[in-house]
Amino acid sequence: MKIRPLHDRVIVKRKEVESKSAGGIMLTGSAAGKSTRGEVLAVGRGRSLDNGEIKALDVKVGDTIIFNDGYGVKVEKIDNEEVLIMSESDILAIVEK
């Protein structure tokens, strides 16, 4: 199934969290925690400004991002894969390679 976000929404696939501590101990369950990094899968057209223009998003498909995993981030299952739907304002940073 193809999904296209509207307005300033972004579809993100959460990246797996490192399951090993700095000391080499394997972490499981809640000790590993949830990652707040993800890969952008799709972006909307942009945010509508008061003058009617559309401001394009700063993120693009393929970007690795750091996001705020809180209120406003919706979790959905698309083709048996969990994805996150969020506004661009929930994105804190783009990880540059």
From Swiss-Prot:
GO molecular function: ATP binding; metal ion binding; protein folding chaperone; protein-folding chaperone binding; unfolded protein binding
Major localisation: cytoplasm
UniProt function note: Together with the chaperonin GroEL, plays an essential role in assisting protein folding. The GroEL-GroES system forms a nano-cage that allows encapsulation of the non-native substrate proteins and provides a physical environment optimized to promote and accelerate protein folding. GroES binds to the apical surface of the GroEL ring, thereby capping the opening of the GroEL channel.
Gene3D superfamilies per record: GroES chaperonin
InterPro entries in alphabetical order: Chaperonin_GroES, Chaperonin_GroES_sf, Chaprnonin_Cpn10_CS, GroES-like_sf
Domain of life: Bacteria
Membrane-spanning parts: none
Recorded family membership: Belongs to the GroES chaperonin family.
HAMAP family: CH10
CC annotations in GO: cytoplasm
Stated name of the protein: Co-chaperonin GroES
Subunit-structure text: Heptamer of 7 subunits arranged in a ring. Interacts with the chaperonin GroEL.
UniProt-annotated location(s): Cytoplasm
Cited CDD domains: cpn10
Keyword annotations: Chaperone, Cytoplasm
GO biological process per UniProt: chaperone cofactor-dependent protein refolding
